[in-house]
Amino acid sequence: VLTAAYVNDLRGAFRVLQVVYGSTSTATTNNTSTFADTTLTASITPQSSSSKVLVMVSQNGCFKSGANAENRMNIRLVRGATTIAKMSGDLFLYTGNAESNGASASISYLDEPATTSATTYKTTFMNPNNTAACIVQEGSAVSTMVLMEISA
């Protein structure tokens, strides 16, 4: 039996407290094995240090240059300066000719930042082959990030 007092206790739990949306369509190139920003970022200031943040990312327009027959791309989700998740271990972009192949990477990640300070999330990418350019947001493809603060 659900009493009024019990329902009242549950009222504050697992509620969405705020939602933040970020997007970019800026084409960005990286031809090194060092992680670089994709320009996709969003910031949230949690209302409680016990809140969780659900991070949902769609990284689009992932292409390789046509100069290399084989290329890979690694994409990471970063909070502040800390990598918190791999979005793609090796997003494999392959073509046997001069044409580029495209792909997308997405992730839903439940984070526990344990802070009430402004917290910034972003994605970074690099080319482990270090031989040809990897591109995100190619052709002005839109990449998006949604941050949802969820009460504990």
Specify the residue positions occupied by each region the protein language model found.
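Extended, low-complexity regulatory regions
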Residues: 40-42
